[in-house]
């Protein structure tokens, strides 16, 4: 069964991001423990000694669960969850490594060896589940980050639109202010023209009223002189009115 132990242990070590040195040390310890098994009490038919290369007891390992690189700390807020999942995966590998180093489950009977294989297989399954959980957490973090980026871009677009509106109304307000000053200047200039014209109009009006009053008085005096038979005075008044 050494081939099965080697493959299962090597896969778990790779999944828990162990170094190459640790992998060599563990494989060496597994080989030493198996070489120390008592031969007399063992079932030689069920436990043939095979080379680690080309062992028929090699465990089938899903291709989809091959070693991956965990990009921890990529996303703010999700990095903590990803790190914790990685720590759980490494702890699972540590537990299995400790089990191999201390020789837990190593017995002289086929039953003990079968139990030991079941323990390794369960640890392998748990490690794969932890490994998958890391990527599920990371995918969730990616989606959350994309949603946050979408909200950020939407906010930037709204902010840009508000700035455009603000700039437009600011420019319009500046234009209206300029127009107001222009109109105020024009009205001031018109006032400087209208005021003298108004004064002149009032002067002309007063002169006309005086002229009409003088004519009325002259006609009254002329009629009175004519009725009195004073023709010299009447003629004099006629000459004065003609000169007006």
UniProtKB/Swiss-Prot annotation:
Residues 1-21 form the signal peptide. Residues 37-46 have a biased composition (Basic and acidic residues). Residues 37-56 are annotated as: Disordered. A motif (RxLR-dEER) lies at residues 50-68. It is found in: Secreted; Host cytoplasm; Host nucleus. Its main location: secreted. The keyword Signal applies. Induction: Expression is up-regulated during the early plant infection stages. The keyword Ubl conjugation does not apply. One of its GO terms (cellular component) is host cell nucleus. Keywords: Host cytoplasm, Host nucleus, Secreted, Signal, Virulence. Belongs to the RxLR effector family. The RxLR-dEER motif acts to carry the protein into the host cell cytoplasm through binding to cell surface phosphatidylinositol-3-phosphate. Secreted effector that suppresses pattern-triggered immunity (PTI) in plant host. This is Secreted RxLR effector protein RXLR-C05.
């Amino acid at each position: 069964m050494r081939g099965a132990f080697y493959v299962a242990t090597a896969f778990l070590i790779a999944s828990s991001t162990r170094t190459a040195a640790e992998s060599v040390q563990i494989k060496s310890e597994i080989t030493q423990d198996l070489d120390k098994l008592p031969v007399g009490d063992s079932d030689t038919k069920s436990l043939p000694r095979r080379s680690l290369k080309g062992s028929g007891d090699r465990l089938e390992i899903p291709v989809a669960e091959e070693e991956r690189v965990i990009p921890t700390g990529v996303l703010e807020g999700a990095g903590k969850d990803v790190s914790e999942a990685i720590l759980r995966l490494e702890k699972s590998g540590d537990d299995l490594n400790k089990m191999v180093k201390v020789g837990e489950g190593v017995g002289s009977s086929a039953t003990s060896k079968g139990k030991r294989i079941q323990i390794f297989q369960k640890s392998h399954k748990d490690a794969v589940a932890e490994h998958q959980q890391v990527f599920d957490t990371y995918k969730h973090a990616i989606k959350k980050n994309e949603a946050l980026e979408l909200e950020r871009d939407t906010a930037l677009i709204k902010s840009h639109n508000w700035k455009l509106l603000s700039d437009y109304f600011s420019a319009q307000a500046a234009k209206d202010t300029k127009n107001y000053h222009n109109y105020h200047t024009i009205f001031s200039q018109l006032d400087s023209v209208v005021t003298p014209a108004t004064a002149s109009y009032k002067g002309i009006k007063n002169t006309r009223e005086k002229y009409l009053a003088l004519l009325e008085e002259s006609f009254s005096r002329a009629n009175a002189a004519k009725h009195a038979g004073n023709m010299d005075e009447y003629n004099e008044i006629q000459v004065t009115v003609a000169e007006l």
